Amino acid sequence: MCGGCVGTEYPERGTTCLEGGSFLLNFVGCARCGRRDFVLLGNRAAGLHGDDEIITYDHLCKNCHHLIARHEYTFSVVDDYQEYTMLCLLCGRAEDSVSILPDDPRQMTPLF
């Protein structure tokens, strides 16, 4: 992975967890060939680790195939919530939690 290709290493992305794609605003250009072009996705793998679904892939320079970053996305169900995480040098770090119930108990206001 190459810190010279990105503007900010592991930027904080809040709840934006990407299952695919790239955060191109953080790509400053390839440290090897010096070009700023599209980013290819390679070596994509999806599988289960216990009850977690994990998707990994590499961000590669379109021109010289230099490895910019490795991307990891996870999905799991914990209690009544769908949990998402993302960790990537280029795309950043993020977490999200969504209730599987029609009404999210965390969003309900107490009556008293």
Curated annotation (Swiss-Prot):
Record-annotated residues binding Zn(2+) 1? C2, C5, C30, H66
Q: Name one GO biological process term.
A: positive regulation of DNA-templated transcription
Gene3D superfamilies in the record: Transcription activator, Churchill
Entry binding sites for Zn(2+) 2? C30, C33, C61, C64
Summarize where Zn(2+) 3 binds, as residue positions: H59, H71, C88, C91
Q: Does the keyword Transcription apply?
A: yes
The molecular function terms of the Gene Ontology recorded here are: zinc ion binding
Keyword tags: Activator, Developmental protein, Metal-binding, Transcription, Transcription regulation, Zinc
Keyword Protein transport annotated: no
Q: Where is the signal peptide?
A: none
Q: Which residues form a coiled coil?
A: none
Under InterPro entries, the record lists:
Churchill_sf, Transcrpt_activator_Churchill
Q: What does this protein do?
A: Transcriptional activator that mediates FGF signaling during neural development. Plays a role in the regulation of cell movement. Does not bind DNA by itself.
- Protein family membership: Belongs to the Churchill family.
Stated name of the protein: Protein Churchill
Query: What organism is listed for this UniProt entry?
Result: Gallus gallus (Chicken)
